[in-house]
Amino acid sequence: MTFNKKINEIITLLSDLNILELNSLINEIRNQFQIPDIVSTIQTGNKTKPEANIIEQKESAEIKKSNFELILQTVPTEKRVAVLKAIRNTTSLDLKGAKDSIADLPKKLLDNLSLEEAEKAKTLLEEAGATVILA
């Protein structure tokens, strides 16, 4: 099957994402294009094999992973102040520590987080303008 250049680039980028990042991407695509969540619209007895596998893989990944790391990928120059404030609000770092944490990216900012804590911290940092991944 041949794809155009843009599609090949997208597939290459997608292959580097972890399961949580893919899940976030799917949710954003659903919201952007107003696509209903197929998992919630499928009745348990009516699952097709591929749909059942996707659901089982998602549940399995959620069960296996209980501790997460928050990795700060990028901080746009114009968003530095907002990101520094968000870092100080999500960590115990002082201003110097927060500045040091954005000096050499990517950098692990937090570790041993529950999924809920990790998602909350990720949301705060992304709202401030940072690019963050959970691992």
Curated annotation (Swiss-Prot):
Any one annotated GO CC term: ribosome
Gene3D superfamilies in UniProt: 3.30.1390.10
Keywords for the protein's UniProt record, in alphabetical order: Plastid, Ribonucleoprotein, Ribosomal protein
UniProt GO BP: translation
Subcellular localization: Plastid
Family matches, as InterPro entries: Ribosomal_bL12 (IPR000206), Ribosomal_bL12_C (IPR013823), Ribosomal_bL12_C/ClpS-like (IPR014719), Ribosomal_bL12_oligo_N_sf (IPR036235)
MF-aspect GO terms: mRNA binding; structural constituent of ribosome
Principal localisation: plastid
Domain of life: Eukaryota
Function: Forms part of the ribosomal stalk which helps the ribosome interact with GTP-bound translation factors. Is thus essential for accurate translation.
Listed HAMAP family: Ribosomal_bL12
Quaternary structure and partners: Homodimer. Part of the ribosomal stalk of the 50S ribosomal subunit. Forms a multimeric L10(L12)X complex, where L10 forms an elongated spine to which 2 to 4 L12 dimers bind in a sequential fashion. Binds GTP-bound translation factors.
Protein family according to the UniProt entry: Belongs to the bacterial ribosomal protein bL12 family.
Protein name: Large ribosomal subunit protein bL12c
Organism encoding this protein: Helicosporidium sp. subsp. Simulium jonesii (Green alga)
Gene field: rpl12
